[in-house]
């Protein structure tokens, strides 16, 4: 699996791995790259079956497989220890990595994540699946911003959204791969295992997230033994895109604090 690695800003700089959500594209993290690369070696990638890592996914594709293939790619690149920043599905992969490779994951940042899928989130995906079956890739892509961004943010950026739609259609991961990745997301359940995650965790959520209620982050916070929760008042599900200034400040402070906390505990 292909990874994109930034040059380390100094010798032995900590590594931060960015894991996007269901869309799978590493470019989702573009608003974070410049600030992160000043202090960390940053790893981005397109998830298997998407972008520049094309593949046909098995019907039983799982979050555990997503975590294993990423860890193996990191080890092959010479990376043994890394912090994880995961958004939604990416946060699930991050938790799986922390469970399966505890000696490697130094810190976990969960952005609009959850322990197991919430009934409201499941309803949203059911609607989106019906759109995919009835209207194909175009209907899926055109509906996606409604679940990602606040209404006023979208209304002020119509040309940008039209360009994003065209790009998403051109690089659509395919119906079968999308549904298999979505099914992996829906099957994931960390409610009985989260208390085994021992690395420090920062939980970031947005109070106006239409797709994932903030209660999901509260449940995560209660279940994770060494966690802190930060709530952004605005930004929607893709709060790192819509309000990068606020998000980046939380992320940078969280990474620095938790990495220091972990080193002090060793």
From Swiss-Prot:
Transmembrane segments: none annotated. It catalyses: carbamate + 2 H(+) = NH4(+) + CO2. Keywords: Hydrolase. One of its GO terms (molecular function) is hydrolase activity, acting on carbon-nitrogen (but not peptide) bonds, in linear amides. It is an enzyme of class 3 (hydrolase). Coiled coil: none annotated. GO terms for cellular component: membrane. One of its GO terms (biological process) is nitrogen utilization. Pfam families: Abhydrolase_1 (PF00561). Its EC number is 3.5.1.-. InterPro entries: AB_hydrolase_1, AB_hydrolase_fold, AB_hydrolase_sf, Pyrimidine_utilisation_RutD. Involved in pyrimidine catabolism. May facilitate the hydrolysis of carbamate, a reaction that can also occur spontaneously. NCBIfam families: RutD. Belongs to the AB hydrolase superfamily. Hydrolase RutD family. This is Putative carbamate hydrolase RutD. It comes from Escherichia coli O8 (strain IAI1). The lineage of its organism: Bacteria, Pseudomonadati, Pseudomonadota, Gammaproteobacteria, Enterobacterales.
């Amino acid at each position: 699996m292909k990874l994109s690695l930034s040059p380390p800003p100094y010798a032995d700089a900590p590594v931060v791995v960015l894991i996007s959500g269901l869309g799978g594209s590493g470019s989702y993290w573009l608003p974070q790259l410049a600030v992160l690369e000043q202090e960390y070696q940053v790893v981005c990638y397109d998830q298997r079956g998407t972008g520049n890592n094309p593949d046909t996914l098995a019907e039983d594709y799982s979050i555990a497989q997503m975590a294993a293939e990423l860890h193996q790619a990191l080890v092959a690149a010479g990376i043994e220890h890394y912090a994880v920043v995961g958004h939604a599905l990416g946060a699930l992969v991050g938790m799986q990595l922390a469970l399966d490779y505890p000696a490697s994951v130094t810190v976990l940042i969960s952005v609009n994540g959850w322990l197991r899928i919430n009934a409201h989130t499941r309803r949203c995906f059911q609607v989106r699946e019906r759109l995919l079956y009835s209207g194909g890739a175009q209907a899926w892509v055109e509906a996606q911003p409604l679940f990602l961004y606040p209404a006023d943010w979208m209304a002020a950026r119509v040309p940008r959204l039209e360009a994003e739609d065209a790009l998403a259609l051109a690089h659509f991961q395919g119906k079968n791969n999308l549904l298999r990745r979505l099914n992996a997301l829906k099957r994931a359940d960390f409610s009985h295992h989260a208390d085994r995650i021992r690395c420090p965790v920062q939980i970031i959520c947005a109070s106006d997230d239409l797709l994932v209620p903030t209660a999901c982050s509260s449940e995560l916070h209660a279940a994770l033994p060494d966690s802190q929760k930060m709530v952004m008042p605005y930004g929607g599900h893709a709060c790192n895109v819509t309000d990068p200034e606020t998000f980046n400040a939380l992320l940078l402070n969280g990474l620095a604090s938790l990495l220091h906390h972990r080193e002090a505990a060793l």
